[in-house]
Amino acid sequence: MSDRQSHDIRGVQLTDDSYVVEQSLIRSKYKAMDKAGNVVIRGEQKMFKLKEEFPFVDANDNKVSTVKAGGIVDVAGNYILKDAQTGEDIVVLDNDYSILQDTWKIRDAKTEAKIAEINSQGALVTIARNVVPFGGWIPHKYEISDQDGRNVGNIDGQFSLKDRYEIT
């Protein structure tokens, strides 16, 4: 990660304190919007890949990052976030799969030190989303904590046919 002190993605300016992430109804397509509704970043899953891959572009269609699965058909595994402009791995996203709770650990790609953790809130909601027909329509709620376990943000799902999250 050269001499960078942060885990920023070159070409992406995140200046608001909240964003909305919305998934397309049909495919694994996502867009993140700022408070004014402007698209900051968007991406879609590449089809027919053995390893899941999500390239992301900014509002001007410039490539900014890629998220790629570490393994084939990775239900509980890791994903690498790579800066498209520098080619550097930025962070590793570890998914600890459980029917009771969704947990993502975010680690520095170089040192492997834990940077943050994202945990779903409410085991019953997580079970319903995974088991009940149409359970995917139930909104998720997540808590984001830093490496010391302090709350630094939240992700609140909104009831919708497609996943829609407010990140604060």
Residue ranges: model-predicted function:
Residues 1-168:
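Intrinsically disordered, low-complexity proline/glycine-rich segments
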